[in-house]
Every structure is written in C-alpha cells, then in structure tokens.
Amino acid sequence: MPLMVQSAPSTEAIQLPKTSESAQLKRIRHTMSHVMAMAVQKLFPKAQVTIGPWTETGFYYDFDTPEPFTEADLKAIKKEMVKIIQQKLPVVREEVSREEAQQRIEALGEPYKLEILQGLTEPITLYHLGDRWWDLCAGPHVETTAELNPKAFDLESVAGAYWRGDETKAQLQRIYGTAWETPEQLTEYKRRKEEALKRDHRKLGRELGLFLFADPVGPGLPLWTPKGTILRSTLEDFLKQEQMKRGYQSVVTPHLARVDLFKVSGHWQNYREDMFPMMAEDDEARGLEQGFVLKPMNCPFHIQIYKNELRSYRELPIRLAEFGTVYRYEQSGELGGLTRVRGFTVDDSHLFVRPDQLASEFLSVVDLILSVFKALNLKKFKARLSFRDPESDKYIGSDDVWEKAESAIQAAAETLGMDYFIGVGEAAFYGPKLDFIFQDALDREWQLGTVQVDYNLPERFDLEYVAEDGSRQRPVMIHRAPFGSLERLIGILIEEYAGDFPLWLAPEQIRLLPVTETVLDYCQQVADQLRAIGVRVQVDCSGDRLGKLIRNAEKAKIPVMAVIGAQEAESETLSIRTRATGDLGSLTVADLTKRLSSAIAEKLPHL
C-alpha cells in the first residue's frame, strides 16, 4: 500500500544522495527504523521486534503481531514517530556482557532478539532512545532524534516476510519506510517512485501482453506470449549475428546433469543453497551419486564440449556460445517480476584461450558488450571490478591464481580507459569479474553484462591443449554474458523505454488502420508485402471508428500507424503516423518499405 504524493516540477533537478555515499543518511535511516519500532510497541504492546536495517532508499522493520497492520495503523504509527522525533531524545550506545543482554531481553519477553543474541560475538551493543526504549544493535546511529527531520520521512507499505528468510519459520509483518535529509529530497523521491510505478515492467508487460506468471506453473517461472517471444527472439538474433561476426560457435546443452559434474566444478560445494534439490535416478537405492540437478550455470557443459577432443594451440581461441536456461532456487520473497526469477536464459559464452591471447580476447569481449549497449541505447553505465574478499573462504583456487586473474582484468580496464571501481567480495566463487552497472532513467542501478577471467575451472577439469612445442598446456577460460540474463534485460528495457520500444525491437512495428471494410483487401496486400521483407505488421480488423483505432494503437505503443481509406487504396498509398514524430504524410508502399527496411537494419529508434 504505497503512500505517494504528486511532486512539484521544481524538484526535477534535485540529486538524491545514495546511502552508500552518505554516512549521515545511513545513520538517519537506521535510527528512523528504531523510532518506528518504538512507536509500534507503544501503540501495539503485543508486537515483538526482530530486525530493522537501513536500505538504499529508506528502512524497514519486521514485527511479529497478532493482527496485520492496516493503512490506518501506518498513519497512527507515523504520527507517533513524529512525536518521538520532536522530543529530541538522545541516542545512546551501551556495551553489555552477553549475560546482561540475555537477562534484559528475557525480561522484555523478546524471543527473536534472544535468537539474534546467540549469533553475536562480544562486545554486545545496545542503542537507547532516551530512557524508554532500546534495541540490540551494532549501529551506527545519529546522536539525537533532533537530527531527524519529521517532514523528510514517510511510511510506504506493509509486506509479509519470513523470519530469517526461511519459509518454514514464522511469517512477520514488515513495514517499509523512506527517510531523507530534507523534505525536498523526499518529494523528489516520491516523484521518481510514482514514475517508476508507471514504468513498472510487471504492469506494462501485462498491459502490452508480453509475459505472465501462472500459479499452476509456479512463482519465478515466466511464460512468454507470442509478442514477448518476438521480443526475446529479436534480441537473441541480434546478439547471435554479432557473435557470428566475431567467430563464436553456437552450442546447445541440456537443462540438467549428474550432480558429479557440479562437484568437480565446485558449484555443489559452494553454490548448493542456490540450486534446486537433487533428483534421484530411477531407484533411490542406486545412491545419491547418481542424482541429477537442474543446472545453475552453463560453464561445466561447455567445458565438456571442449574436452571432447584434444585441442591444438592453432585452434585457440575456441568461443562457444549458447542461450542457455539455468535455474536458481530463489526464495519466494526475493522474486520480483522478470528481474529476479527461478528459471532464466543467459546469453552465455565461454572462451578457451592461450595465455598470450587473454588480453586481446578480453578486450574483444568488452568491445562486444559496449556495441550491444550502444544498439540498445543504454548510455549510462559504469564498470565494477568484482574481486574476491581475501578474508572469506567461499572462493576456490590459490592466491597466485586469483592475483593473476584480477591483475588481468584491471589491466584491461585501464587499457580501455574505463571509469571503474573495485567491488571487494563481488567475485564469483571461481574467478573475478568485470561487471557493467547500468543506470536507468530513474537513476536506479542494475547489473547487466559481465566478463570473467577463470584459471580455476580449467585446473579442476584438467583442460589441456597441445602447445607449439608439443607439450600439454592449460588454457584460460573467459566467461561472458553481454545481456547477463535475457529476462532481467527485458524487464529493464521495458522500464527504460516505458514500453515504447525502438522500431527495430518492437514486437509489432506497424499497424494498418482501415477506415472502412472496403479497403481490407488492400490492407492485407500491403501487410503481405511488408511481411515479405521481415516487417512485423498487423491489420486492425475490429471495425471501430478511426479515432478508436488510433487510440488502441497508441495504447499498445505501436511505433508506426498507417491510416488507409478509399483515397489511399485508390492511389495505392498510405497515410503514415508515428508515435515519435506524428504525421509523416502520404507514402507509397515502395517508399514505406524502403524507409522501414533502412530504419530497422540501422537499428534506428523510430521511422
């Protein structure tokens, strides 16, 4: 139940700070979550508190309550929060022993906090709001509620959430809020959120008839309609053509494999919690070693194709490419339209290269990714060098191998003069990555293309090639995916374009609008000529008045409309209208065909 207001045009130029860049904003939001919890427990004494962190746009807190919160409850909670803020309560940090913390929590009857305490190491810290309320928390916070602006926050919605993200545990009530440093920032945030709701790919995807989710199929498993399938196929065909120019070879691999394959790759040991459960083969008595799992990644399959024969140094680089569907067991609460699904298609490719080819092939992959972004008119992006966290044990391979791979990626980024930043802990478990972070029309960030250098999987699978001197040498692998995930890309494109796809990408590129039934035969003749050159065209045979025909085409966001009446049929012309530029006047079929062919081939946004 989002609570939104119409913003004023004067806020257009406001730059919203990001939590990651503003320590004060982080403190404001973290303290605001505590203020909200204090208000909730005053108004609803039976509510038990769990966790309440800051987020990139605000904060939330999870509560265990006898009854769900209502819209009226949110208003009352917000009003109470304003009272707490205006009291200018000091926010005091206190260190206590584990025993002291346990005694205090037990005295309050807070079982969730007691469970949290069990997983903490000393010193245990508490944060107090005045002398009336405290929370088990590591901070940071503001020093007093006087630093919180009562006109710069709002409570937005209530949602269900499972304790610890575990569907088998208690379902809680999560209240989401947003908080900023100034009222102007709050107004601008709400304006952007309202625009985001208009662009929401779930809403537009339904209205434009592109995809759907069905309960009998299951959550996170999208179904693609004919129009949505055209959109997917157009993107796939585009990338396949670009890959063919660069010497890629297409392969096809199955959707599942024996678990042993993923034990060798390390996925079973390091990625198992994100994989679907194992399926037993025929008779469970044959043992779990014979079990099958849905693939979470395509790389082990491409490795098997490489290993099928002994390779010569002359054959390398070998570039294997596949639009392969993979499966990740995302929690239901983490699913979100097309951007977070359980089954998705990756534009995957794995390059097997000699060490002396690594730099040039890496640069070539980056060039491909940049050309894809250009064709899609995705202009605002930055590069993240995703390196391992040396303090974590979730990675495979030696320090030397990791340092070599990370150095190769950083050298490539510097050679290209890229604006990059390093993301420690963002690497895949088997190797570092160069990730492209796209910033959309609403300044939200999404990870799209990625390219990875991998010395580990060639070692684990004992990959070899025959060198020029006859010795057996180890190739280096490059993993790359310009789109990242086809589903996520389409979700992002729907929102970036607000459903107004560029002409070359639109599922329906032109709609013919007959003014009377007497011109239907002529419309079908024109449609046949356009289809013959690959143009996606439909004839509106509904019989509605012209005004409604145009409105329906506008609502469906068709790039080009051709109005055809008796005069056009007699002169064998069409009256052309586009969404982007309005009326183009009268064109012959030959002229329209020529202009459409040229615009689509050049991937122009409109006619």
Swiss-Prot record:
It is found in: Cytoplasm. Keywords: Aminoacyl-tRNA synthetase, ATP-binding, Cytoplasm, Ligase, Metal-binding, Nucleotide-binding, Protein biosynthesis, RNA-binding, tRNA-binding, Zinc. Its main location: cytoplasm. It catalyses: tRNA(Thr) + L-threonine + ATP = L-threonyl-tRNA(Thr) + AMP + diphosphate + H(+). GO terms for cellular component: cytoplasm. Residues 200-502 are annotated as: Catalytic. It comes from the Bacteria. SMART domains: tRNA_SAD. Signal peptide: none annotated. Its EC number is 6.1.1.3. CDD domains: ThrRS_anticodon (cd00860), ThrRS_core (cd00771). One of its GO terms (molecular function) is threonine-tRNA ligase activity. Its cofactor is Zn(2+). GO terms for biological process: threonyl-tRNA aminoacylation. PANTHER family: THREONINE--TRNA LIGASE, CHLOROPLASTIC_MITOCHONDRIAL 2 (PTHR11451:SF44), THREONINE-TRNA LIGASE (PTHR11451). Homodimer. This is Threonine--tRNA ligase. The gene is thrS.
